Amino acid sequence: MIPATYTLSQITAQLGGEWRGEDISVTAVRPLADAQAEHISFLANPKYKAEVHDSSAGAVIVSAKAADGFEGRNLIVADDPYLYFAKVARLFSPVVKARGGIHPTAVVEPSATVPASCEIGANAYIGANTVLGEGCRILANAVVQHDCKLGDEVVLHPNAVVYYGCTLGRRVEIHSGAVIGADGFGLAFAGDSWFKIPQTGAVTLGDDVEIGSNTNIDRGAMSDTTVGNGTKIDNQVQIGHNCKIGSHTVIAAKTGISGSVTIGSYCIIGGGVGTVGHIEIADKTTIGGGTSVTHSITESGKHLAGIFPMSTHKEWARNAVYIHRLSEMNKRLKTLEQQLSDAGQDSK
């Protein structure tokens, strides 16, 4: 494939910003350390300005504040260099559009609705009464069971599975190995065994949701598990049944959200977080990696962290410095206790 080429003026014409220096052509985005003359790079943090001077990049995306001192360099000045870099990267890696057609080995049930603009890959399966929007890509070995509804331009990567009755909004992307709508973990104890509670809800994903590889979102017990517009969920995340996740929230890998948890919009949840069930997490909450969330977070905008039971980030940082000194502090405490005990004996 011939690489795309853009001049700096073409980039700023599409994305805004101001180019300075020569109007050179670039073919890809690269890190400062690896970039060559045909590449464009970026400086997100001004404390790394020295790396710009050492870089062979043909052009660099910088903020207006950081642009001083780079005379002679080809620059694009942008309000948010990191966001601008992401948009430039998209120019060089455009979204793949569906090539209309159904592979001969795919199985599409007669009652399914599959527009001619959809791409159905080898050994893929589309169940009865399922309706696909325009331009969907259901790739090799992916499965959409019966009675599902998919919006326009949904992408299911190889071996992704959507169980029956689920609804996916426009431009949803499900990566390989992810399972949407498997049974929730609902059981009732029957005295000597566990009785499985039928999971009669489904899963509803809003527009522009992205689900990472090998992530599971369980169907609701009676009503749907829901994920709001623009939310991004990383690989190997478990979302329990009946969860309600707001819009534009991000959840990193290895996190487990127990059943019936409500998470607000614009939250940031780090990797390896675990929650108890039936709690609420307010909008714009940030939870650091590895945190155990044991109770509801009712105040919006909190930043929480801790391997131990959850605390504010400030409290956790203040206490964390003592973790490696606990043994030493314990010995000192025992010594002081002994000295106090001895002093008490001597005074008698």
Curated annotation (Swiss-Prot):
Pathway: Bacterial outer membrane biogenesis; LPS lipid A biosynthesis. SUPFAM superfamilies: Trimeric LpxA-like enzymes. Keywords: Acyltransferase, Lipid A biosynthesis, Lipid biosynthesis, Lipid metabolism, Repeat, Transferase. GO terms for cellular component: membrane. It holds the Pfam family LpxD. GO terms for biological process: lipid A biosynthetic process. Signal peptide: none annotated. It catalyses: a UDP-3-O-[(3R)-3-hydroxyacyl]-alpha-D-glucosamine + a (3R)-hydroxyacyl-[ACP] = a UDP-2-N,3-O-bis[(3R)-3-hydroxyacyl]-alpha-D-glucosamine + holo-[ACP] + H(+). InterPro entries: Hexapep (IPR001451), Hexapep_transf_CS (IPR018357), LpxD (IPR007691), Trimer_LpxA-like_sf (IPR011004), UDP_GlcNAc_AcTrfase_non-rep (IPR020573). Transmembrane segments: none annotated. The active site is at H241 (proton acceptor). One of its GO terms (molecular function) is N-acyltransferase activity. The keyword Lipid biosynthesis applies. Homotrimer. NCBIfam families: lipid_A_lpxD, PRK00892.1. This is UDP-3-O-acylglucosamine N-acyltransferase.
